[in-house]
């Protein structure tokens, strides 16, 4: 199987659709046995973005749970629409459905943001079901602040132009290239382009709006579990200041800085995520 095929395929495992009260159906895949590791992807992405991370994790004695965020991949959007509280509620539902105890929640980009909202909204769930969290290329709101890339791309998303840009191989690949650091394989760019083109439609604009408008930094002190904060030093989407604040204001947090790496840590440094998860589960 080629690298591109390995990246784009849906992982094999037990497929579950969790029904939410508003009609949302959350597409989940689980595999393995042992302490639970939950992988939460970012905006316009899908659970497939974790294929390289999964390749490493499956060598460990862990149970991995991946899911498509509502409105992404095979997960639908229910009557309550797209909002940070609704999506934090989805996290809660997944933790409860899989009866997670002493789990490690790994959130990338928006997935990390929603982990913060989960901890703020449902602190008892985090304290009883999670052993630790890992916030990768993450933030806690006001995501346009200090990011020229976001200030340029958000108007394109709001205008409904992003899918058209991403469907153009030249324009799309040029844009996706900015999500990575110094060195990147062409397969990573192409697979990311295809996935984001399918999910960045105009009816998903609420996903952008709540990350721009909401500020959950004042709530970071409420996070009571050990937290690893991972950031690429060339991240243009969630610049360094976000991870600096996460690391400084979450009581039991530790920063990891990745030289030459951009926003797409799940592709650029999956071995780092795997290594840190191993330390957390053990």
Where are these regions (language model features)?
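Conserved alpha/beta-hydrolase "acid-adjacent" motif
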Residues: 236-242
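Conserved HGGG/HGGXW glycine-rich cap/lid loop of the alpha/beta-hydrolase fold
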Residues: 24-74
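Conserved alpha/beta-hydrolase catalytic His-Asp/Glu region
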Residues: 144-147, 165-221
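Short beta-strand/loop motif that positions the catalytic acidic residue
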Residues: 223, 229-231, 235
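Alpha/beta-hydrolase fold catalytic core
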Residues: 1-37, 59-62, 100-101, 281-282
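Flexible "cap/lid" loop of the alpha/beta hydrolase fold
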Residues: 116, 120, 124-162
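Active-site loop/oxyanion-hole signature of alpha/beta-hydrolase fold enzymes
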Residues: 21, 66-110, 126, 275
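Catalytic active-site module of serine/aspartate enzymes centered on a nucleophile-bearing elbow/loop
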Residues: 253-282
């Amino acid at each position: 199987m080629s690298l591109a095929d390995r990246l784009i395929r849906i992982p094999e495992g037990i497929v579950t659709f969790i029904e939410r009260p508003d009609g949302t159906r959350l597409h989940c895949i689980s595999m393995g046995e042992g302490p639970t590791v939950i992988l939460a992807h970012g905006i316009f992405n899908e659970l497939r973005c974790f294929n390289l991370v999964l390749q490493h994790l499956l060598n460990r004695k862990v149970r991995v749970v991946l899911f498509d965020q509502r409105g992404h991949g095979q997960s639908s959007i229910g009557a309550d629409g797209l909002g940070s509280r609704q999506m934090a509620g989805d996290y809660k539902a997944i933790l409860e459905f899989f009866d997670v105890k002493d789990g490690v929640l790994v959130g990338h980009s928006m997935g990390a943001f929603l982990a913060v909202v989960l901890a703020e909204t449902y602190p008892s769930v985090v304290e009883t079901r999670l052993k630790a969290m890992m916030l990768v290329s993450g933030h806690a709101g006001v995501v346009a602040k200090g990011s020229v890339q976001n200030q340029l791309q958000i108007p394109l998303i709001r205008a409904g132009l992003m899918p058209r840009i991403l469907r153009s191989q030249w324009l799309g690949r040029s844009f996706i290239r900015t999500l990575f650091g110094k060195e990147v394989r062409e397969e990573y760019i192409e697979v990311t382009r295809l996935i984001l083109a399918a999910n960045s439609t105009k009816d998903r604009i609420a996903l952008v709006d709540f990350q721009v408008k909401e500020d959950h930094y004042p709530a970071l002190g409420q996070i009571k579990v050990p937290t690893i904060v991972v950031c690429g030093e060339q991240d243009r989407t969630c610049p360094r200041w976000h991870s600096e604040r996460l690391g400084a204001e979450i009581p039991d947090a530790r920063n990891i800085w990745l030289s030459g790496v951009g926003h797409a840590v799940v592709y650029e440094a999956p071995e780092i995520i795997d290594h840190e998860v191993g330390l957390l589960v053990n």
